[in-house]
Curated annotation (Swiss-Prot):
Biased composition (Low complexity): 355-366
Main location: nucleus
Biased composition annotated in UniProt, kind: Basic and acidic residues: 276-297
Listed Acidic residues bias regions: 298-307
Subunit structure: Interacts with ripply2.2/bowline. Associates with tle4 in the presence of ripply2.2/bowline.
Biased composition (Polar residues): 367-394
Role according to the record: Transcriptional activator. Plays a role in ventral mesoderm specification and acts together with nog during muscle differentiation. Mediates posterior pattern formation of the embryo, including specification of posterior mesoderm, via activation of the Wnt and Fgf signaling pathways.
DNA-binding region: 105-278
Native species: Xenopus tropicalis (Western clawed frog)
Matching SUPFAM superfamilies: p53-like transcription factors (SSF49417)
Lineage start: Eukaryota, Metazoa, Chordata, Craniata, Vertebrata
Recorded GO MF terms: DNA-binding transcription factor activity; RNA polymerase II cis-regulatory region sequence-specific DNA binding
Name this polypeptide is given: T-box transcription factor TBX6
Gene symbol of the encoding locus: tbx6
Amino acid sequence: MYHSELFQQYGTSYGMRPPHALAPTYPTAGGHHEAYRYPELDVPGQRFDGLFPALDPSQRILGAPPLTPLSLPPGPALGFGQLQPPCETPQLPGNVKMNLENKELWKQFHSIGTEMIITKSGRRMFPQCKVSVTGLEPDGKYLLLADIVPIDNSRYKWQEDRWEPSGRAEPRLPERVYIHPDSPAPGSHWMKQPISFHKIKLTNNTLDQMGHIILHSMHKYQPRFHIVRAQDVFSRRWGGCSSFTFPETLFLTVTAYQNEKITQLKIQTNPFAKGFREDGMKSKRDRSTRVKRKVIEPEEEEEEFQPEGECKRPLYTGPCDSTLSEELDIGRGLGIPLPSPDCSFHPITPPSRTPPSTQTPNPSLTANQEQGAALEMSSQTPETFLQAAGQSYPEQPPVRGGSLYPCPTDGHGAQNQRHPLSVQRLPQAFQGLQESLGNSPGEYKIYGGDVGCGGDFAPPSCAVAPSVRPSEERLPRGYSMNSELRFPHFLPNGGSKIGLQFSGAQLQRLYNGGGWM
């Protein structure tokens, strides 16, 4: 109510009237939550999947408008165990036919009782559904669909070598439709060859998000196939629909095969189950043995063609695996043959990028290999690496002032230095050996040179001072002048180890008569 003098444009005021009395059939305020409040909107069996309403006449959304003439008219609500009638109007021409291609295979399983495995991740069907279509218009666009529906209202169990009903079926799950990947396609495409639905997967996961068909275990189901004339999958205007079923395709869903005859028949007829046959590799151990045999046999064939003059690295399988090529010739470019490498081995000469050819039956040895074969080093003792100075390392021209690389020592240490050979800070195992060599007629020296270290604060590594022989000015035959020369970080023997840590560039300048730096 408003004041008429202040709001004259609204006219005279009207008094408040009491509300109209409610109809006697209208529920009271306390019963508004009851289901009979809106009886005209109470639709049994409501579902909200309206993608293909023509395939399911019972699909009615709450408050939705009535179905259009292009789809099926609404029918009575279907309970459990009642087959849904196929789409009736509009129909495709009567000459449209569908045949089951692998009908004989389905009959073999149907005579025993077909069982289909369902898993949480989804399992494909075997036998697969393969059909052929005739009577379509060559230029018309068609969709091919498939769905699986229960045939009764019972749950089954395997008892006394047969399937028997064991109670009421589980509540019906939301039905899903499988659309053939070639849809839509012209009729000529569908009729030129059989159509396979082998990609259909069955699952018992009610929360599946992969689009698999959800089924209950221990229930009987029947696949259905539909031909729909439409321009695209989401078209709401269909020109016609025909549905087909084959009684041979009826099956029971299980999580594990119950009938032993079904198991044997699937092993015999399924090409992907050959591993379970009597002549197949059934066990995991047998399969692993077969894989190992395939890996070992090619290696044995390669070893037959391996030349004798080449050194092949062993195949490692531990944490110290080598990343170099298996056929790396690790003895190339060296004056001596190398022992078998271990985890700390580093080749002195960088490996060749081209592996040795295995086609040459008798490869010619290089000069370094000939020299290594002549040395015939058979043991890995400290004496093995004590080479003659004139044969192992090149001699340098005379240098004034004595040794090329004297260690920095004080005056007292210089007076106590012995020539031509002095060893300080060497392990005790080598000191006795070095003294015995120093007292013998001087032909042998450690690595062909003097070893000297200075002071208590000197680095642990020792400098090598090669012997000076003016009479010999050329390098020994077969020695590789490689700027990337590296000494191994160890001597592979049972005694103490000496580390010679010099770069290739420093040794190169040493051999050429230059300075240390």
